[in-house]
Design a protein with these regions (language model features):
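ATP-dependent phospho-/nucleotidyl transfer catalytic cores
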Residues: 3-83, 95
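Generic, well-ordered alpha-helical scaffold segments in large soluble proteins
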Residues: 4-7, 66, 85, 119-122, ...
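Regulatory N- and C-terminal appendages and interdomain linkers associated
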Residues: 15, 57-76, 152-181
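Active-site-proximal structural scaffolding
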Residues: 75, 79, 84, 109-112, ...
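Pre-DFG segment of protein kinase catalytic domains
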Residues: 81, 100-103
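Catalytic-loop signature of eukaryotic-like protein kinases
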Residues: 85, 89-92
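Activation segment
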Residues: 94, 99, 107-109
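Active-site activation/catalytic loop segments of kinase-like enzymes and analogous catalytic loops
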Residues: 106-149, 165-181
Length: 181
């Protein structure tokens, strides 16, 4: 993931051969408005009450506005290519032990925090995520820099990661209450 993000970090290709890609904020807005994603995310959040911590569930009315704010923040952050749907079923390992991603229909231009938050929050058990997330983010930052990305302070990366957890949550909750259309 860091190789992808580093390769296209603030790349001229984003305004050139990849200029056809939507930004993450535009992609999210189109999905929320045209596909009814926004209401379904809220319904799904409420249907997941049993698995959402009580202190978070009490703030249910704040979740969608916070999600929109986190998506909007992408407009002012440095851009790269983001896959945007990096859950485990979209990963594979090649015969020579390299990792790859499939299902590129959500690919867009945005901040790498989107993919990082999504992959860590959807791929790890809660206890493992809590135990490993800081180390994994530090490793990601090292690889990002080694592949052409910025030298990002951990505190900044931690904030990007946490802000983008709202979008990861929103991307998953509609599966609990699919739109009847």
């Amino acid at each position: 993931l860091a190789k992808l993000h580093g390769k296209y970090y603030q790349s001229a290709a984003l305004q050139g051969e990849l200029s056809y890609l939507n930004t993450w904020s535009d992609f999210f807005t189109i999905t929320a408005n045209e596909a009814g994603f926004g209401p379904q995310a809220d319904i799904g959040f409420r249907e997941a009450k049993e698995v959402i911590p009580a202190n978070l569930f009490k703030k249910a009315d704040q979740i969608w506005p916070a999600t929109l704010a986190s998506v909007n923040a992408h407009k002012s952050l440095p851009h790269t290519v983001v896959h945007s749907d990096v859950h485990l079923k979209n990963w594979y390992i090649t015969a020579n032990k390299h990792m790859g991603l499939s299902d590129w229909q959500c690919m867009c231009v945005g901040h790498w925090g989107r993919d990082l938050a999504y992959v860590l929050s959807t791929s790890l058990a809660i206890g493992d995520r809590r135990a490993w997330e800081k180390d994994l983010i530090q490793y990601y930052l090292k690889e990002l820099k080694a592949n052409g990305g910025p030298d990002t302070p951990f505190g900044d990366a931690w904030n990007y990661y946490r802000q983008n957890l709202f979008g990861a949550l929103a991307w998953w909750t509609p599966v609990l209450s699919p739109n009847p259309d």
